[in-house]
Design a protein with these regions (language model features):
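Acidic/polar helix N-cap motif
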Residues: 6-9, 135
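Short acidic/polar active-site loop segments enriched in Thr and Asp
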Residues: 125
Length: 143
């Protein structure tokens, strides 16, 4: 099920964020960087974002649930990078992560659809996102 995230999701978001990072970036980022990730720190970050009305107004966070557990999420909002704003990218997709076991089920497309609709509802028609050049699976998905 796709839905907007709430502050009650912060703990699960933190856990999924770290697990998905470890799955996605193993072999692409230094092990020390991955080992330094903390579900508690990520949960606190999501609690700040979801609990702050000014942050929530700028950032939309969606979750995918399977059997009442969050298995993926995406976030989008106003472009934070001034260089990209100057190039006409007024919006950004700041995160999209799915646990590997949940990939290939259409959840990623559902998240992208929700974020695209959110961005369009804000009057934007150009969006940017960052992806590692070496992350072939993600690049294939976005293309």
């Amino acid at each position: 099920m796709l839905r907007r995230a709430t502050i009650e999701d912060a703990a699960q978001l933190g856990s999924v964020h770290v697990a998905a990072w470890n799955e996605t970036y193993a072999g692409l980022l230094p092990e020390a960087m991955l080992a330094g990730q903390s579900a508690e720190a990520r949960s606190a970050m999501w609690a700040r974002i979801l609990g702050d009305p000014s942050a929530a107004a700028g950032t939309a966070v969606y979750v995918i649930e399977d059997q009442a557990s969050i298995v993926g999420f995406g976030s989008c909002g106003h472009q934070r990078d001034p260089r990209l704003r100057e190039l006409g990218f007024a919006a950004e997709i700041s995160a999209i992560y799915l646990l590997r076991s949940q990939q290939g089920k259409g959840f990623g497309r559902a998240l992208m659809g929700a974020m695209t609709a959110e961005i369009r509802s804000r009057g934007h028609d150009a969006v940017a996102l960052w992806v590692l050049k070496e992350n072939a699976a993600a690049r294939d998905f976005y293309q």
